[in-house]
């Protein structure tokens, strides 16, 4: 028999979703306001989407969504429904926020607005990294996930004695390194700052 959730359970879940949403807003703003305008990328499926966007112009949010849709087919079967539900919510919301902020954070010509000025790649990199890292930290600390390498890491962690932080770092290093070799530009690499369970990565 399935027990009926208590009021405290409902409030706890509601709190999780509120903070997950706030974390996603910070993450999406870090990308659209500071990373995309300066063609900087990080690890994760958002980073893969950024590489595709810089190379082809294909919208970052749709690459992110398509990749995660594939990964979620595996996550639903392997990981618990609670993880899958919150991850699905985060994927849809982050896709929306990336799309929305790219519509409004533009210059007079409709191009991504460089908020900290032209040539300020390093400063934009630092600010964007902090916003993205804080956002991801809030999401993870409230039992959420943005999908992508987080899903891969969670699946591996379930069967192998490998910490989430190490697995995510490994995936991020591959993504960021491939970006450098493809474009041969240091600006497209980023010190990936995140919650305490992650390690710093740099290409």
Features from the language model and the residues they span:
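Short, Lys/Arg-rich, polar N-terminal cytosolic tail immediately upstream
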Residues: 1-13
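Structural signature of hydrophobic alpha-helical transmembrane segments
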Residues: 55-65, 121-126
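Alpha-helical transmembrane segments of multipass membrane proteins
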Residues: 29, 51, 72-74, 96, ...
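Mid-bilayer segments of alpha-helical transmembrane spans in multi-pass integral membrane proteins
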Residues: 92-104, 121-142, 163-164
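Single conserved hydrophobic/aromatic residue that forms the stacking wall/gate
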Residues: 191-203
């Amino acid at each position: 028999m399935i027990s009926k959730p208590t009021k405290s359970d409902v409030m706890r879940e509601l709190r999780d979703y509120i903070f997950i949403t706030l974390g996603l807003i910070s993450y999406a703003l870090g990308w659209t306001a500071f990373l995309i305008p300066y063609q900087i990328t990080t690890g994760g499926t958002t980073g893969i989407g950024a590489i595709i966007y810089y190379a082809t112009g294909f919208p970052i949010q749709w690459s992110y969504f398509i990749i995660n849709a594939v990964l979620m087919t595996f996550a639903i079967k392997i990981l618990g429904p609670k993880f899958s539900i919150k991850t699905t919510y985060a994927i849809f919301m982050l896709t929306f926020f990336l799309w929305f902020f790219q519509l409004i954070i533009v210059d007079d010509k409709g191009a991504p607005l460089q908020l900290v000025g032209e040539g300020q790649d390093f400063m934009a990199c630092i600010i964007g990294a902090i916003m993205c890292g804080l956002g991801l930290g809030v999401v993870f600390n409230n039992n959420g996930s943005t999908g992508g390498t987080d899903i891969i890491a969670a699946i591996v962690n379930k069967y192998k004695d490998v910490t989430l932080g190490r697995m995510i770092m490994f995936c991020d290093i591959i993504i960021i390194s491939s970006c450098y070799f493809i474009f041969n530009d240091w600006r497209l690499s980023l010190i990936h700052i995140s919650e305490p369970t992650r390690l710093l990565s740099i290409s």
